[in-house]
Amino acid sequence: ELIVVEAGRIAVALDGRDLGSLGNRRTPFEGPGDALYLPPGAEASLRAEGEGARLVRAAAPPPDGPGPDRPGPDRPGPEQMGLVPRVIRPADQRIAEVGRENWRRQVRTILGPEHEALRLLAGETLNPPGNWSSYPPHKHDVDAPPLESRLEEVYLFRVDPPGGFGVQVRYHGDVDGESDRSATVVVDGDVAAIPSGYHPVVAAPGYTLYYLWVMAGVGRAMHPHLDSRHAWVDDPGDGGRPGGAVTSSDRAGR
């Protein structure tokens, strides 16, 4: 599981051993924060230091029983992987400005494929007012590496100022044809489950939109599949014209 300190400070003890304090921000809009990764079987004691401490716990069940998720020669369990609890500071995270124009946003990868973990992938995205993210639209609901990897995802939203909102868009197939499509208003504290489909997000003008994203699947490779009809917007060499589709999955950001 992954514990992200959203605000304030918490004292952490692991198996009776004091790990010190986690937390370096008053809100997630201030910048990247501290996190704690706990592999299956690890237990930690957490205690708030003062008022205003707020944390988020994200977890995925360890592979168990028959089926493709079960540990085996091709998929070791936490003991075989040598996974240990660890503190993740802002300096350990990959922070990048992704996109351009009104789909530019900051992405903070807390737990990426390059970090040792059993199932989880996680990070934070910060949309400036009026800007889009998870754009060009992408999905990850089919296991077809290296073109796409199957990962379920959850978003936890925060809005600054908190009275604002954003919009979570979801669609399958052709957005202008007969397909499953929706647009949902999200406010501060909302959670959105994304089991499948393309899922871009936009912040309302005047409000900064933050979301913690957490993914889990059989594997931990991130191969998002871009909607090729809209991928051209991220290709500066195409002159900003539709029709010059970019399909490389590694171009997608959160």
Where are these regions (language model features)?
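Catalytic core of Fe(II)/2-oxoglutarate
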Residues: 180-191, 198-226
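A short secondary-structure junction signal
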Residues: 67, 80-88, 120-123, 131-140, ...
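Glycine- and acidic-residue-biased ligand/ion/polar-headgroup-sensing regions
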Residues: 1-20, 33, 129, 141-190, ...
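Short, structured patches in soluble enzyme cores that scaffold and shape functional sites
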Residues: 48-50, 57-62, 109-111, 123-129, ...
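Double-stranded beta-helix
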Residues: 52-109, 205, 212-254
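Conserved metal-binding segment of the jelly-roll/cupin
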Residues: 29-49, 60, 185-206
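An anionic, turn-rich surface loop/hairpin at beta-sheet edges
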Residues: 23-29
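A short glycine-rich, His/Asp/Glu-containing loop-to-beta-strand
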Residues: 101-154
